[in-house]
């Protein structure tokens, strides 16, 4: 409801912010302009004692209320200072990347296709230079929702397996006969962590059945009001805590996708939770106090297990209060579909997807005015998977690049990649993804401070994001419409630029240009207070980098290799542009082009002989700030890229220093 989703927000009064550190507090400013912050408990001292909410000497202490002074009465400044306070009490949430199985096979996952997807994704990531994922995640489809005694439905074999639920709780279906052991071991072998989806309310397909299974077993209750599990029942939260602890102990789970909580308060007084209060607030307070205890217990267990990057992602039906960040790392944006499209002039998939989700950001920030850091929003992007999306072969490499980079300027720390490996095989998308993730992580200290500029794209308006950290900035701009439009903004504190930039020169570099037709005068300079007006073509997107420091370092060649008898690949330490002119000694160059991720130059030559050494020279390249790249290097072509081969001990130098053994003898050894 509108009432529940607005709970736990701060109040701004002139140059101050006020609020309660419990995220389910009612905060409002009434018609007389009086601000109220109300915490609803409804508990007797006996109940407080039962729920371990009294001090050791029998006293009750309420949640803390906070008041803070900001540097200005300007709302943007108050918000920035309030977020600084939130950051000081929040659990640490660094830039994070992980792979999730959902849009690959949705609920039809099993041991085999999870193993296949994980292996293919890791291979693609590692071969394109991506650091190990923080987590590989198994989404919904592992739980057994089947029970003939509580449901009259036929077993859904593909999604839930063939057997009945026998424990009366969350349990593995027979598609996962060894639990998460194969998947978690595989993730560990990649140098990554392992993540798990759990739907507290029972998921979204069998929530009623799961609620009845749990109630029949005595581990919780079925909520008839919402047709799902009663997530506030203390028996359920206690049993779920035990289940989570077992998972962390057994599989070192470092990510919990907690998908779906209470949509309405349960009014059944026979359930093990509070009822009553204004709008059922006794229920909501009691529910979230129980879950906060669960979060704290799991974090303590994570420390015991050496899990140093445990992440809680709270998804649907969670009011976006910034005070949840004391325990959780990210919260679903709430006002959006998982995947949505809106067409406002451009009908390409990249345009429809960006216009929809960015429109939801404008609704969240500008219309509803939720005070929640954009860095901690879970937005369900990027999605480029085969199931339920109709996205296969629907993005060119340039569109995929634009999709990722524009999303990056929203500022989120949390990158859960909803990919299918065969779709990332299209074109050069592995390399584009790798370059993007490297850029986003490197610039996260800037991107996380994103502010919206322009107006909502779902009405066809120009818009973008402005991100700043000290003397560095990144600004994105996009025109979603079918006509030429302008975007204007002032480079000042309202878009996040620090006032300390006054009088200083900012060097501007183009990071992305999509559908740009005019010849940009690049490497320009701008200053604080300048009014920036940009003319954008239909569907055009641009991203600028701004800094007081000027880049004067030329691109450096980091790798040169012959990948085939007619192909030479040159890799640079940064993105390069231009039209390469190349020569290869003893061979003709028939084609020279910059790769889609702009980190490589690919040369096609006449046939090279095995073992031949050639000299490669390339000119006509520069980095994004205009520094020229000079390439003059030697490359040796080795057939099938085999440098040396040994088939017997006698083929080796110092053969006496080598011990022959077998795989069996090495088993269990490091």
Q: Can you annotate each of these PLM segments?
A:
Residues 566-594, 619, 633-637:
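Short, surface-exposed alpha-helix to beta-strand junction/turn motifs within ectodomains of secreted
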Residues 432-439, 446-455, 621, 641-669:
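Disordered, acidic Ser/Thr/Pro-rich linker "stalks" and the adjacent N-terminal cap
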Residues 135-379:
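Aromatic- and carboxylate-enriched substrate-binding clefts and catalytic-loop regions
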